[in-house]
Amino acid sequence: MRNIDLKMAEINKKFKAQIINQGTDIIEVAKIPFSSPTANWMTYGGIPVGKITEFFGGEGGGKTTSALDICANAQKKFNEVFEQHREKVLDEIEQLKEKDTKESKKKADKLMSDLMEYVERGPRVVVYIDAEQTLDVQWAQLLGVDTEAMILVRPQEQTAEQVLQIAIDLIATGDVGLCVLDSIPMLVSQNIFNEDMDKKSYGGISQALTVFCSKVTPHLTQQQCAFIGINQIREDLASMYNTVSTPGGKMWKHACSLRLRFRKDTLLDMNNGELTSRAENPAGNRVGIEIAKTKVCKPDRRIGYYTLNYTEGIDVLADIITVSLQYRILKQGGSWYYYLDEEGNVEVDAENNEIKFQGKAKLLDELRNDEEFKEDVISRLDKVMYNENK
């Protein structure tokens, strides 16, 4: 064994953590997916686990909706991981019991004891820090969030430092798989908390966030917890090019591995047809996403859109069409949409007729009504996206 290997083991033992690893032992970054295939396509699988992600943009842009969507998918993922591990351990226990030896019985008892403790802890949880006090529980449930299982933190008169410390303490337990802070500008730092309203202050919460980022980052990595900070935008008065900035200071931006900007785009009717900005009764809108920064995937898919329906939530089927066109599972020719096989030829049905649809509305109806066709498209889409994201 090399001297450096001995020293690495010594250092890891000293600090009681695996802080030094050989390159081949580096853990691949896991992702929590969006429901939107377009958002997953842009980010190569979703937001990174063990790192900080920022959702920022103007009011009504889709930041909170997208964060709640991630919460719902995180809960599903945590439950699946929990059940898979439980089933795996139960299988191991059964195999040990079949051996019927003293040693195997001892191992089985130990595994059962560990399993009971694991089951008692349950799946990992989502923490939502509602600093804005504006969380709509019904909307969250519509998006698929199990609000009963989610831990909701609603600060009353706590300072930014206290709220951020609460987040660190909860993440450090190891039971939290995702923490969302909504939103950064609503936090008030200690140095201005007790000041009068008319007294000028400088720096805002930058200092508190600087300390927070330094403290929380190792916990996120060690506990494999994802963190989303929702942020607003401000007009940059110092710029002559009508640019915008975000509160929180430079350290916050540096600490974020992924920064996504959300914009409210075109209004839509019930059939996803475009409406004017003055439409009185829109049924939804497109949500524009721009990757402002990424350190966890290639930055080659900077801009995309997903469809938001005001009564049903995220319109996954409309998104499936968009991404299927990118991967040539579907092909558009004029107003017609063609379903392609893996060789790029138009698929035919049992009567040897081409599988094609005139207009996006017809294709959407087919995806809604033909479960077999929908599952086939989703299966092929998942396959190519999974292989690409590995």
Question: Where would I find each of the regions flagged by the language model?
Answer:
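The Walker A/P-loop phosphate-binding site
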Residues: 2-149, 172, 357
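Phosphate-binding/switch region of NTP-binding enzymes
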Residues: 170, 202-327
